[in-house]
């Protein structure tokens, strides 16, 4: 089903909520991205910064593979990137995760 650009409510979800749910669901559907996101969340809770080098050390993936997966997580909003000196550090965006879970709950209640 195709939805027009204006904000339309479908089964109690707005178009932007539908876009959020589909984008985040697609991003987390890949097992590697789910594990990368969980790792970043865990390290951020411990007040640790996470860069690509850390992810390459923690996982058995090439740097290029991790970079591709991180682009998807950043694009959907689950991860924020902050450039500091020579490195790009990744931070879990818990606000987007909360909006996602709220939208999924709202959809499942209908």
Short names for language-model regions:
Residues 1-28, 76-78:
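N-terminal leader segment of winged-helix/HTH proteins
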Residues 19-62, 84, 88-95:
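N-terminal helix-turn-helix DNA-binding core of bacterial DNA-binding proteins
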Residues 70-71:
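Short, hydrophobic-biased segments on the C-terminal half of alpha helices
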Residues 76, 80, 94-95:
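DNA-binding patch around the recognition helix
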Residues 77-79, 85-86, 101-102:
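Short, Lys/Arg-enriched C-terminal cap helix and immediately downstream tail that follows
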Residues 88-110:
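Short, Lys/Arg-rich amphipathic alpha-helical interaction segments
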């Amino acid at each position: 089903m195709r939805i027009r650009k204006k904000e339309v409510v479908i089964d109690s979800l707005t178009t932007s909520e539908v876009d959020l749910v589909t984008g985040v669901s697609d991003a987390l559907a890949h097992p590697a991205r789910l594990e990368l996101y969980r790792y970043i969340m865990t390290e951020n809770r411990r007040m640790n910064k996470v860069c690509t080098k850390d992810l390459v050390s923690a996982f058995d993936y090439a740097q290029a593979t991790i970079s591709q997966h991180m682009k998807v997580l950043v694009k959907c909003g689950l991860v924020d990137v902050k450039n500091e000196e020579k490195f790009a550090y990744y931070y879990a965006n818990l606000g987007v995760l909360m909006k996602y879970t709220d939208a999924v709950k709202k959809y499942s209640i209908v």
